Design a protein with these regions (language model features):
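Glycine-rich, positively charged active-site loop/lid region within alpha/beta enzyme cores that binds
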Residues: 94-114
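Surface-exposed cleft-lining segments at the edges of enzyme active sites
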Residues: 44-45, 109-120, 146-149
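Catalytic alpha-helical scaffold of carbohydrate-active enzymes acting on polysaccharides/glycoconjugates
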Residues: 1-47, 52-100, 123-144, 152-224
Length: 224
């Protein structure tokens, strides 16, 4: 993968859930992963996709501190936008479960994820519906999330191959790494071509607890 020039991003070290960790523990696993990626690729990762898309109140700040350019864990839009924190900014390249191969294919008692397995044709129908909708906008973002042990099975990969051939055959689709897309968004913003939405993080400093509503009390008096 490295030899062929594919981008290597951060996706946790042991698939830990950031939103279940303290800030120091999240930082520890992030640093271990970064060190491992640098060891094998010679450069630091520029992008993150959190395991299971889990995002903590500290994730964005830690990514900025470590020099990350973008995140691709959130699902707040169909197009790229910005995450702004006290530490700086990140480009958010949003994804969604409809382009992830986990829902249609994974059936694992060990992982406590038991779903009816879809046929490759049905899964590709869902993926392609998302792709065609993005393509019709003339500037949409479509990100496939495929796991080697899931989509890599032969019956499924044959359909992935056909889907990619179809995408290439359109002649108007840009195949790019997420880092290239993030750099493109930054340049378009500088040139005034694109004004992405900006989300200020964290949305809330503390857990939001709904106020308990008081039930109206009955007035004392004779029953009717």
């Amino acid at each position: 993968m490295i030899k062929d020039g594919h981008e290597v991003g951060f996706h946790g070290y042991i698939h830990e859930a950031p939103n279940s960790l303290s800030r120091s523990d999240e930082q520890y696993w992030m640093q271990r992963s970064i060190d491992t990626i640098v060891k094998h690729t010679g450069k630091r990762p520029r992008g993150n996709r959190s395991p299971l898309y889990n995002f903590s109140n500290n994730t964005a700040d830690l990514l900025v501190e470590e020099g990350f350019l973008y995140d691709s864990s959130l699902m707040g839009d169909d197009v790229p936008y910005l995450l702004k924190t006290k530490k700086g900014e990140l480009v958010e390249l949003p994804t969604n479960w409809a382009t992830d191969d986990w829902p249609p294919y994974v059936h694992s008692i060990d992982l406590n994820y038991v779903m009816q397995i879809m046929s490759p044709d049905r899964a590709m129908e869902i993926f392609m519906a998302e792709f065609e909708a993005m393509r019709e906008t003339g500037g949409g973002l479509w990100i496939g999330i495929w796991h080697p042990f899931v989509s890599g099975r032969l019956s499924r990969w044959k359909r992935v191959e056909k889907m990619i051939e179809h995408m290439l055959g359109t002649g108007d689709v840009w195949f790019a790494t997420l880092e290239e897309i993030a750099q493109h968004i930054i340049q378009c913003r500088k040139n005034g071509i694109y004004s992405p939405r900006v989300d200020q993080l964290p949305y809330y400093e503390n857990p939001v607890v709904p106020k308990r509503t008081r039930r109206p009390q009955r007035r004392a008096g004779p029953d009717k």
